[in-house]
Amino acid sequence: MINKFTLSRAQNVRYVKEHLETLIQNNLALSRYELDDPLRAVAKQNFEEAYNFILNNPDVENDYRCLMYLHEVLMKNLNSDVKSELNEQKIEELSMMINQPTRANLEIAIDVLLYILDKRLFADGDVRAALLFANKFMIDNGCGILTVSQDKKDIFREKLKKYKEDKDYDIKNWVYMYCVKGPKLDY
């Protein structure tokens, strides 16, 4: 699997800023916030804060502490009972997955996304946290952005279910084909 985009962090940040509203709307739809949901405004504000953190903190390491922080931001004022901690084994697995210099950054980001979703590291908000954590890695490495468009959310959920039940890795290629976005660059 190769990177679809080779951008500077600044180019990647600019792309995200230009498409932020669409990205947030996709995130809200994937997180099952309908237009009439009273918590939608809170969730939207949390996504905005999380993206702001990602875009403005390039020096924050992509590690379990960053993942936990993003989850905390995304769940703020939504479900205060959700407390999550990663055990040493999961911290080590996540670290090993992120630190693979021989693999394309895009593939690492997709694998991290799927790992977080498969292991259900959070009682609630795992899709949100997984997607934004993978996107921090993508943005920091100039690989574009991962987003599941609203017209593809049901297919994503179906493929994710198959992945969790049967370890069907078709989802990895599907995410690569349909969920990686970035600018069209003129050379």
Where does each model-flagged region fall?
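FIC/Doc superfamily catalytic core
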Residues: 1-187
